């Protein structure tokens, strides 16, 4: 299997996001890398499912709450920027203050 650097990055995000999902399901609080991976994964999958950039940016602040992440993590993530493939091409999605 020959993967481009971008494809390797996406696989790493997916792997970390699946771990984050399992930890959330067990009631554990996410650390910084897990929270970023989870948010990034939801953007990538939302784009794949046909959601628009505007929809993802609006929903992005509802995916994680402060009580789902370790202390200090919300302050470490003032925004998340992720490139996602939409039906009309690759676009940059920015989530502002994604953990509220």
From Swiss-Prot:
Signal peptide as annotated in the record: none
Keyword 4Fe-4S assigned: no
Pathway named in the protein's UniProt entry: Nitrogen metabolism; urea degradation; CO(2) and NH(3) from urea (urease route): step 1/1
Chief location: cytoplasm
InterPro entries assigned: Urease_gamma, Urease_gamma/gamma-beta_su, Urease_gamma_sf, Urease_subunit
One GO location term (cellular component): cytoplasm
Reactions catalysed, as given in the entry: urea + 2 H2O + H(+) = hydrogencarbonate + 2 NH4(+)
UniProt record, GO biological process: urea catabolic process
Subunit description: Heterotrimer of UreA (gamma), UreB (beta) and UreC (alpha) subunits. Three heterotrimers associate to form the active enzyme.
Listed name of the protein: Urease subunit gamma
Lineage, broadest ranks: Bacteria, Bacillati, Cyanobacteriota, Cyanophyceae, Synechococcales
Primary gene name: ureA
């Amino acid at each position: 299997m020959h993967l481009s650097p971008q494809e390797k990055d996406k696989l790493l995000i997916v792997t970390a996001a699946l771990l984050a999902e399992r930890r959330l399901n067990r009631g554990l609080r996410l650390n910084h890398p897990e929270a970023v991976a989870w948010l990034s994964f939801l953007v990538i999958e939302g784009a794949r499912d046909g959601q628009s950039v505007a929809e993802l940016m609006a929903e992005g602040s509802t995916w994680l709450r402060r009580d789902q992440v370790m202390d200090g993590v919300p302050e470490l993530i003032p925004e998340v920027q992720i490139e996602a493939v939409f039906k009309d091409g690759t676009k940059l999605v920015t989530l502002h203050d994604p953990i509220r």
